[in-house]
């Protein structure tokens, strides 16, 4: 009997220790999660809870179901210039994307025919394509509030960017939780120099004052989801903003981040201000520029490109009288959600 008690005691001990270990690991992982304030006002866990409760909500009305169905779809907008061969590859690729309502092509090849006739001759296609021919080759043409856009979600893509279907689907699911922000794959930041002049930098660029890296204050719209309202918000910006974009043929993405940040300042509840964007780490994002038979190189190859973007940061700050961009270090990854930002490859 005594030996039986000993065996039972050992058995209980073996059961208790794994449970204690699991509790300790769970507590440690929870402690590692940053509070909402550390993420520039992004309440990640709150957003996830809201999404879960909405899915589990039992009785929903017809109107609510229709609204949810509309939320399940999005529109792709691609502005293109002198890259028809790549464009056709992209159109074929994006036809396989789930929940895609339509693709709008902003055609900046002034005086040249669109490939619409060729596209139609190879029907049927699961996703309709609309070509919007432009009167002039302007960078900000893609930011028009086109009447054809009837989904809240817009995925804007550069005409040399191929994004994998899983990346798109994952980012769309993230955007539905952060639909008032830009959710995209290319983060950038502004850096304040000791003289009060702003400099445009990449994600890893160190801040000379804090020596901090791995934070961002912008998410570029060349591969990003955002709400269609921001197209009209951009159109409503001061004429000086539009003139700056036209003057440089650059910086429309920076201007959009300013516009979104200002909109969030005005419409967000609470004291913590949200950053303009949320960074989603891509798994497979490719640049197809070298595949273009035209040999046309994007404007980012120009030697003055980065200088222009620093100039735009300072000029926009002058126009608005404030620097509205907020920093965040949140990165959302398909293999760790949520996670601290660190997109450097270990390979």
Question: What annotation goes with each model-predicted range?
Answer:
Residues 90-102:
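Short, acidic, metal-binding catalytic loop of nucleotide-sugar glycosyltransferases
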Residues 107-118:
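A conserved acidic beta->alpha catalytic loop
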Residues 75, 153-155:
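Structural motif
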Residues 134-141:
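A short, glycine-/small-residue-rich helix N-cap motif at loop->alpha-helix starts
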Residues 146-147, 157, 161-245, 249, ...:
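Conserved catalytic core of nucleotide-sugar-dependent glycosyltransferases
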Residues 103-108, 184:
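Short internal beta-strands
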Residues 143-153:
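Active-site nucleotide-sugar/metal-binding loop of Leloir-type enzymes
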Residues 2-52, 67-73, 79, 85-92, ...:
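C-terminal catalytic/acceptor-binding lobe
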């Amino acid at each position: 009997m005594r030996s039986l008690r000993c065996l039972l005691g050992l058995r209980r001990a073996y059961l208790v220790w794994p449970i204690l270990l699991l509790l300790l690991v769970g507590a440690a992982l929870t402690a590692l999660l940053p509070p909402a304030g550390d993420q520039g006002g992004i309440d990640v866990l709150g957003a996830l809870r809201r999404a879960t409760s909405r899915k589990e909500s039992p009785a929903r009305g017809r109107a609510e179901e229709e609204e949810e169905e509309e939320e399940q779809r999005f529109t792709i907008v691609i502005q293109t210039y002198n890259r028809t061969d790549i464009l056709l590859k992209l159109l074929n690729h994006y036809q396989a994307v789930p929940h895609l309502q339509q693709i709008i092509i902003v055609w900046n090849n002034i005086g040249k025919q669109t490939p619409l006739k060729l596209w139609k001759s190879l029907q049927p296609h699961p996703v309709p394509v609309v070509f919007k021919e432009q009167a002039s080759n302007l960078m900000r043409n893609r930011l028009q509030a086109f009447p054809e856009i009837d989904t809240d979600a817009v995925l804007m893509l550069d005409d040399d960017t191929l994004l994998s279907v899983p990346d798109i689907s994952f980012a769309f699911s993230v955007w539905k939780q952060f639909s008032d922000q830009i959710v995209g794959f290319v983060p950038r930041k502004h850096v304040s120099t000791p003289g009060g002049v702003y400099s445009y930098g990449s994600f890893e660029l160190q801040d000379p004052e804090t020596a901090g890296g791995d934070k961002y204050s912008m998410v570029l719209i060349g591969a990003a989801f955002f709400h269609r309202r921001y197209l009209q918000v951009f159109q409503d910006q001061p004429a000086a903003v539009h003139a700056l974009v036209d003057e440089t043929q650059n910086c429309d993405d920076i201007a959009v981040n300013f516009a979104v940040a200002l909109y969030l300042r005005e419409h967000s509840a609470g004291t913590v201000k949200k950053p303009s964007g949320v960074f989603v780490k891509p798994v497979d994002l490719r640049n197809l520029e070298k595949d273009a038979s035209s040999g046309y190189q994007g404007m980012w190859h120009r030697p003055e490109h980065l200088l222009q973007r620093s100039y735009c940061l300072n000029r926009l700050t002058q126009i608005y009288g404030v620097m509205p961009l907020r920093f965040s270090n949140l990165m959302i990854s398909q293999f760790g959600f949520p996670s601290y930002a660190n997109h450097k490859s270990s390979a």
